[in-house]
Amino acid sequence: MSRRHAAEKKVIPADPIYGSVTLERFINKVMMHGKKSIARKIVYSALERFSKKIGAENVLEAFKEALENAKPLLEVRSRRVGGATYQVPVEVAAGRRDCLAMKWIINNARNKPGKCMEVGLATELIDCFNKQGATIKKREDTHRMAEANKAFAHYKW
């Protein structure tokens, strides 16, 4: 282990419109090449489309619910024992849960064919809110993989 002190976590300020730290982290994940104003524009217009489509009064609550539906509870980690590598199911930490859900939503929005990012992101958020779509499938696959390797759960760290 390193003898240096542990790195301090950067405190992220809340976003200016909704006052949410979670939304600001989401904007930071959407951002590419340091262009935050473009990322903000994309996320805010996607949230507007999302709220109109689902008919929610509180956009932030609907966004958090969509994010909650995408969060994985379990994942598998490789663990080498003897000469064999086992896929050991472990519980996902709270911070990593958020991070994975955001990453999956954004990647699936980017991979939507022939759509601009705003439309793709809004569509993916709607799908997550309704518990369907590629992000939810990814979450279910992760859970299925953990369930299939439940026999190796005793190899925990």
Curated annotation (Swiss-Prot):
Signal peptide: none annotated. GO terms for biological process: translation. One of its GO terms (cellular component) is small ribosomal subunit. SUPFAM superfamilies: Ribosomal protein S7. Keywords: Ribonucleoprotein, Ribosomal protein, RNA-binding, rRNA-binding, tRNA-binding. Gene3D superfamilies: Ribosomal protein S7 domain. CDD domains: uS7_Bacteria. One of its GO terms (molecular function) is tRNA binding. Transmembrane segments: none annotated. Part of the 30S ribosomal subunit. Contacts proteins S9 and S11. Belongs to the universal ribosomal protein uS7 family. One of the primary rRNA binding proteins, it binds directly to 16S rRNA where it nucleates assembly of the head domain of the 30S subunit. Is located at the subunit interface close to the decoding center, probably blocks exit of the E-site tRNA. This is Small ribosomal subunit protein uS7. It comes from Chlamydia caviae (strain ATCC VR-813 / DSM 19441 / 03DC25 / GPIC). The lineage of its organism: Bacteria, Pseudomonadati, Chlamydiota, Chlamydiia, Chlamydiales. The gene is rpsG.
